[in-house]
Amino acid sequence: MRIERVSTDQFKIFLTFDDLIERGFTREDLWHDASNVRSLFSDMMYEASSELGIELEGMLLVQVHLMQAQGMHIFVTQQYEDNSEDEDYIEMKVTLDESKELIFSFMDFEDIISVTSYLDPMGLENIRLYYMEDRYYMILDHIELSRVDKEDIIGVMSEYANPSIVTSHRIEEYGKLIMEENTVQQIKRFFY
């Protein structure tokens, strides 16, 4: 679990699926076991409070973004209100959002060339390739993922790349688009 302060009233937590397993959760538990999820969030808020040296009080707005292969991004914003009735009460509003895409980052273009030989038989066509901050990013959208087994893709990609915690919105805004469509075929044509 990684905790990072964003501003004086906001911080973010990145929790991998391995972190969830260590805490006794599966991905499905997040959708079906509300009481244990509340307990998990309470524990995470306590850890964040201790690590960042902040006192959590009042209302907390919690946004949870589930990333297909990566884990969860949790954004917590503390709203300060004049709530003199019960200062020890913490209210959390939770928003769950599951990402419908897979994003992988590569350190070296050679790894992208290598992985395309495994992606080609899967028939993947709509993979976007970006370059940003000395890394390459492959984004597979939800339409592409509905045609093949996600676990197969994750297995192949994890041999050559790392799951990205950078969102597609940030990559699209700040990254340089290298290939927008037929990425696998283009790489095969130019490098094989």
Curated annotation (Swiss-Prot):
Domain of life of the source: Bacteria
Pfam families linked: MecA (PF05389)
MF terms in GO: protein-macromolecule adaptor activity
Hydrolase recorded as keyword: no
GO biological process, one term: negative regulation of sporulation resulting in formation of a cellular spore
Keyword ATP-binding: no
Keywords, ordered alphabetically: Competence
Matching InterPro entries: MecA_C_sf (IPR038471), Neg-reg_MecA (IPR008681)
Oligomeric form and interacting partners: Homodimer.
Record remark on domains: The N-terminal domain has binding sites for ComK and probably for unfolded/aggregated proteins; the C-terminal domain interacts with ClpC.
Function: Enables the recognition and targeting of unfolded and aggregated proteins to the ClpC protease or to other proteins involved in proteolysis. Acts negatively in the development of competence by binding ComK and recruiting it to the ClpCP protease. When overexpressed, inhibits sporulation. Also involved in Spx degradation by ClpC.
Family named by the database record: Belongs to the MecA family.
Name recorded for this polypeptide: Adapter protein MecA
Organism: Oceanobacillus iheyensis (strain DSM 14371 / CIP 107618 / JCM 11309 / KCTC 3954 / HTE831)
Lineage: Bacteria, Bacillati, Bacillota, Bacilli, Bacillales
